[in-house]
């Protein structure tokens, strides 16, 4: 969203994560697009779960005022950022770890090219009661507990990727490649995206 690009942040995305986001990026890869993906992750985490991943930014306004002439013209993203900033925080991109990428198989009504991020619990600045209504019955659970749920196959796969990174203590290791899931000729595939492949 265009409004993600103009938000002042407390801390920028780590260079290693920004570079990984550029791997096999379709269209015209750019640092701005990579940053935008991270901004979207922080915004949607607040939007759907009320969780703020933020910090303080000296040059960020205390609040973002809605459009004075016609509030109805305010984009959904701009409205969410205004609500985010009302808690006194600017988005913090530094804790984000780019975990995996997956593309919805062909033939589905809606297809997504999704990037999955994770943060350590200590990066959560505040949990609020903000909720856009898209999700319900939000609860915290362990990875072991999540395995008992009726989850989409790709969600299970991503959670196992997360479990592996946690067990190996590599969440902050910039050299770890990114799992990339997609379908080709009807076959589910997993490729690993390496930073070296981009610099070669």
What label would you give each PLM region?
Residues 48-52:
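Short alpha-helical functional segments enriched in proximate histidine and acidic residues
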Residues 1-23, 35:
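Short, His- and charge-rich active-site/binding loops that engage polyanionic ligands
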Residues 40, 57-60:
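Short glycine/proline-centered loop/turn elements that form peptide/ligand docking sites
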Residues 55-56, 94:
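Residue-level detector of family-conserved "landmark" positions at structurally sensitive sites
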Residues 17-29, 62-200:
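Nudix hydrolase/Nudix homology domain
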Residues 26-37, 41:
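Short aromatic-cysteine micro-motif
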Residues 45:
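Hydrophobic alpha-helical positions that pack around
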